[in-house]
Amino acid sequence: AFVSGFRADYLVTSVGAIEHDGAMMEFDVNEASVVKTMMAHSRHILLAADHTKYSASAAVEIGNVAQATALFTDELPGSALQNLLISSKVEVVEVSSGEEQQAG
């Protein structure tokens, strides 16, 4: 892939779905190929995924959340995935939307 010649300190990416076993899934095979290559060439992987990704399904596996440096999400995942993140030393950052901040 074209991006195989690139190296990055940080990769900020999202995914189509996160399975209960931590598998990160994507819908498009071409996008999956680019993300997998960049993950392999990045020192830190910052993953952004809202709560809908925990129940979504997609066809192409791009890796496992255990590879991530941090997961930024609006809601914490279920206990099995939380345990995997903890044991893999992935920092989980729960963020709120701007609407919630304005309402409070």
Give residue ranges: language-model regions.
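Conserved phosphate- and dinucleotide-binding cores of soluble alpha/beta proteins
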Residues: A1-G104
